[in-house]
């Protein structure tokens, strides 16, 4: 899983330099016709710089970016259905105080069957070369924004951006009012909305569902939970599953003890729980007004409790959570007392923190653009945040390379200065558990991690066995099945082939010499025959003229030739028929004294002759 994050206060859609980013997502071919303007349903961006009410619902206990990513991944990786992506829609508020659902986080797995071509719709083509260049351009601009202004090379986005990947990326710009769209209906009614089939998607009345059908989606399901709505989509038609609905409602319930994940089976990499420092312990999450005097919120770290997440390999990790946090949304926030603070931490359409370089998302990678800013709004004093920032700069980021060659970044930001002692212990634990650098062979081309000697030896033996299998297939007679006998039989077979080649070459040379001798003998006979008394032979023999009769019936022709038997007239007739591309069905020959009579029945093929044309052609070739 690859985790992409930005600074929590960076807004990609409202800065002056990046104001065209929203248009980049929404101005592709026919996108404007399939998604109505955002003002009709939801509010996704703002350009106001004055202090505004807080837009995000206060973070609930146990809700943070790391566990949300793991929950989304475990949801679709742990099922036998072929889900393509999973998105968590997080409730928040617009400037009017109305509740809306916005992008919380997402996980893109990709299509199950990579051997088959990508599913495409018969609607207007979204995968033309021009559209592909446009998608790559938008993705490169997004990469440069996320990587802090460093423009990535063109090789970073060299593959095609598939329709499902583009649909997943464009989903970051979506938001839903309560009761609008599939996610809004699921959040308003509390019931799952399951739409399967391209016809049902186009007739669902939701523009996003129609767009998903255009991009090859066949199933979109929105399942409400206590803290938001989980949307899963697939390129295959999948029937409604009550097990998946129950799993979502348990897995994404962050309130109190209902969110305990110890009994769930997370179908993840077994080493991921041990290698990823972000899974060992999570920082406590602050709530609005938790540090203000008189609000009755305890500040002692003893009021925190931890929940255990059980993985398949038996390793566990803890998530620190405050049970006294109030999950109730609060549209009016005390941050309005400080305009500078509000401008820094007000949520518009922000991305989460990361310093990693972004590339095109592949199958099985988490594309994290969720909002992970853990904020403490109760203390308007900027000095506390500057101190917190200095502490965070001293913390080490842990970068772990899992066994499946997926790069994972773990970076935590604290929400309260009261828990600095807890954070310090976390930093020490991360530093102690850092994996040592492996010593082994240098990585080959395209390999991210060098192989150790055990893996290299295993691959060498597999390659050697494959070659022995190929050798056994070409050797005809194998005495025994062991490798030594196989090599001996192969050597004997090769020597036998060599002897056959030598013998064949000698026979070829012998036949060539015999042919030369026959040619010399024929030349001598012709010379002796021509040196005789030609006048006496000509006077004694009466020349016989040549007569050719031809009859054509449809595609067949009957040929009768009367000529002298000298100079092989039968061979000349057959040669003429071959040159004229005539197929011989029947032929006969008889000799009376010096007269030879030939009869042949032939069939015309590609060339069609008349009776006169065929007779003239035969006379020119035989006579």
From Swiss-Prot:
What the entry lists under InterPro entries is as follows: AIB/MYC-like (IPR045084), bHLH_dom (IPR011598), HLH_DNA-bd_sf (IPR036638), MYC/MYB_N (IPR025610)
Q: Which residues carry this modification: Phosphothreonine?
A: 328
Output one GO BP term.
Answer: regulation of secondary cell wall biogenesis
Q: Result of mutating residue 563 to D?
A: Abolishes its activity in the regulation of ABA-inducible genes
Region entry JAZ-interaction domain, spans: 93-160
Location in or out of the cell: Nucleus
Q: Which UniProt keywords apply?
A: Abscisic acid signaling pathway, Activator, DNA-binding, Host-virus interaction, Jasmonic acid signaling pathway, Nucleus, Phosphoprotein, Transcription, Transcription regulation
Q: How is it modified after translation?
A: The phosphorylation at Thr-328 is increased by methyl jasmonate treatment, facilitates the proteolysis of the protein and is coupled to transcriptional activity. The phosphorylation at Ser-563 by KIN10 represses its activity in the regulation of ABA-inducible genes.
Q: What's a single GO MF annotation on this record?
A: protein dimerization activity
Q: Mind telling me which SMART domains this protein's record contains?
A: HLH (SM00353)
- Domain bHLH span(s) in chain numbering: 448-497
Query: What does the activity regulation annotation say?
Result: Down-regulated by KIN10 that controls its protein stability under a phosphorylation-dependent manner.
Protein name, per record: Transcription factor MYC2
Q: What is the lineage of its organism?
A: Eukaryota, Viridiplantae, Streptophyta, Embryophyta, Tracheophyta
């Amino acid at each position: 899983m690859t985790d992409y994050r930005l600074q929590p206060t960076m807004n990609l859609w409202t800065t002056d330099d990046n104001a065209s980013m929203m248009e980049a997502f929404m101005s592709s071919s026919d996108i404007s016709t399939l998604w109505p303007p955002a003002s009709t349903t939801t509010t996704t961006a703002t350009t106001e710089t004055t202090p505004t009410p807080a837009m995000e619902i206060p973070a609930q206990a146990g809700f943070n970016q790391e566990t949300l990513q793991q929950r989304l991944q475990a949801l679709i990786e742990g099922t036998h259905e072929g889900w393509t992506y999973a998105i968590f829609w997080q409730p928040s508020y617009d400037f009017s105080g109305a509740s809306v659902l916005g992008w919380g986080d997402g996980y893109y797995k990709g299509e199950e069957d990579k051997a088959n071509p990508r599913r495409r719709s018969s609607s207007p083509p979204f995968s033309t070369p021009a559209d592909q260049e446009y998608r790559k351009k938008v993705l490169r601009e997004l990469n440069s924004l996320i990587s802090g202004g460093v423009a990535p090379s063109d090789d970073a986005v060299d593959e095609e951006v598939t329709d499902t990947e583009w649909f997943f990326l464009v989903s970051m710009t979506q938001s839903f009012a309560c009761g609008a769209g599939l996610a809004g209906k699921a959040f308003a009614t509390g019931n799952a909305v399951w739409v399967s089939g391209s016809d049902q998607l186009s007739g669902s009345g939701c523009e996003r569902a129609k767009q998903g059908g255009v991009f090859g989606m066949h199933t979109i399901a929105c399942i409400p939970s206590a803290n938001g709505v989980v949307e899963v989509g697939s390129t295959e038609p999948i029937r409604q599953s009550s097990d998946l609905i129950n799993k979502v409602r348990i897995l994404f319930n962050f309130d109190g003890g209902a969110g305990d994940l110890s009994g769930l089976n997370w179908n993840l990499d077994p080493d991921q729980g041990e290698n990823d420092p972000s899974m060992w312990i999570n920082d406590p999450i602050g709530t609005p007004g938790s540090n203000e005097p008189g609000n009755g919120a305890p500040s002692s770290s003893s009021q925190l409790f931890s929940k255990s997440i059980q993985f398949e390999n038996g390793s566990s990790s803890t998530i620190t959570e405050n049970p006294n946090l109030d999950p109730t949304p609060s549209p009016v926030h005390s941050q309005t007392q400080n305009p500078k603070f509000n401008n820094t931490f007000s949520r518009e359409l922000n991305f989460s923190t990361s310093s990693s370089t972004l590339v095109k998302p592949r199958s099985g990678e988490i594309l994290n653009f969720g909002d992970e800013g853990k904020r403490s709004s109760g203390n308007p004093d900027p000095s506390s945040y500057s101190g917190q920032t200095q502490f965070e700069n001293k913390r080490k980021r842990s970068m772990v390379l899992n066994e499946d060659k997926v790069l994972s970044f773990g970076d935590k930001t604290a929400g309260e200065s009261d828990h600095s002692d807890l954070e310090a212990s976390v930093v020490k634990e991360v530093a102690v558990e850092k994996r040592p650098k492996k010593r082994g062979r240098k990585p080959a081309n395209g390999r991210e991690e060098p192989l150790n000697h055990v893996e290299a030896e295993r691959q060498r033996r597999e390659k050697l066995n494959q070659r022995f299998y190929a050798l056994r297939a070409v050797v005809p007679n194998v005495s025994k099945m062991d490798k030594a006998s196989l090599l001996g039989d192969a050597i004997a077979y090769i020597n036998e082939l060599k002897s056959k080649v030598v013998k064949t070459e000698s026979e070829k040379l012998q036949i060539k010499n015999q042919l030369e001798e026959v040619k010399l003998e024929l030349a001598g006979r012709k010379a002796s025959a021509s040196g005789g008394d030609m006048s006496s032979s000509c006077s004694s023999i009466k020349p016989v003229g040549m007569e050719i009769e031809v009859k054509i019936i449809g595609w067949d022709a009957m040929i009768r030739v009367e000529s002298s038997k000298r100079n092989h007239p039968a061979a000349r007739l057959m040669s003429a028929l071959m040159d004229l591309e005539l197929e011989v069905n029947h032929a006969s020959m008889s000799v009376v004294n010096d007269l030879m009579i030939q009869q042949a029945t032939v069939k015309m093929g590609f060339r069609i002759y008349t009776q006169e044309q065929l007779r003239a052609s035969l006379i020119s070739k035989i006579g």
